[in-house]
Amino acid sequence: RDIIKIKNSFDGINIKLMKCGSIEEALKMVTLAKKYNLKIMLGCMVETSVGITAAASISSIVDKVDLDGNLLINNDPFEGVKVVNGKLSLPNANGLGLKLISKNDSLV
């Protein structure tokens, strides 16, 4: 657990869902960071709306959010979380609410 190692050296952590591996692992990291009074930022890499929407699903429990990686690609075959008036807006559907909008063979 890197959080335990750095808890006295830093004021906060940046969780990237694609690097920690799962929503479940991210939630464990959030719990541990809160235990040590660390600030929590939820970040991302350049990725499709699948990863961004998954990360956005836990955004309400962190201090800061930077989830714009899907806005940096022009061939995202999915529709998920959107930015509305500067705030994340999750889809109103079951699960993550993702919608396949195009089958892009270049992503396979």
Which ranges hold each PLM region?
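Catalytic core of soluble alpha/beta enzymes
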Residues: 1-54, 59, 74-86
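Short helix/strand-capping turn motifs
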Residues: 64-66
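C-terminal extensions of enzymes
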Residues: 77-108
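Beta-strand->loop->alpha-helix junctions that form or flank phosphate-binding loops
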Residues: 68-73
